[in-house]
Amino acid sequence: MSGRIFLAVIFLTFVAATASAKTRVAEFKGSGNTTTAIFRVESPWVIDWRLDGDYEHMMGLEITLIEAKTGKHVGRVLYTKRRGNGVKLFHTAGLYQLRVSSTLARWTVKIDQLTREEAELYTAKGSN
């Protein structure tokens, strides 16, 4: 009997962990300009970015989304000249790369796959 309970607990723990957790697809870090490795995502997904630097008024970061197969410019994801962090939600699946351009800055970009339920929790500022 205790063996069945143990197996049930293990199974429920596994199901709960896989059903509710976002999945890290890729993470990129740097302090200069680069085009990232190719990554594949399903809808929905987010770009989670962070920017830091030593020169408050001289730093900058621009991130552009590129379709990996064609090299087509999908759009600018971010342009900032200030320290900070944020997320951008996407509803399109695909094979992508990021083109990152930075000036006097250290940046981190994480690509996270979400469930539909997790995506519903993301709302834009001021959209109450």
Residue ranges and their predicted role:
Residues 5-14:
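Sec-dependent N-terminal signal peptides
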Residues 16-18:
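N-terminal signal peptide c-region/cleavage motif recognized by signal peptidases
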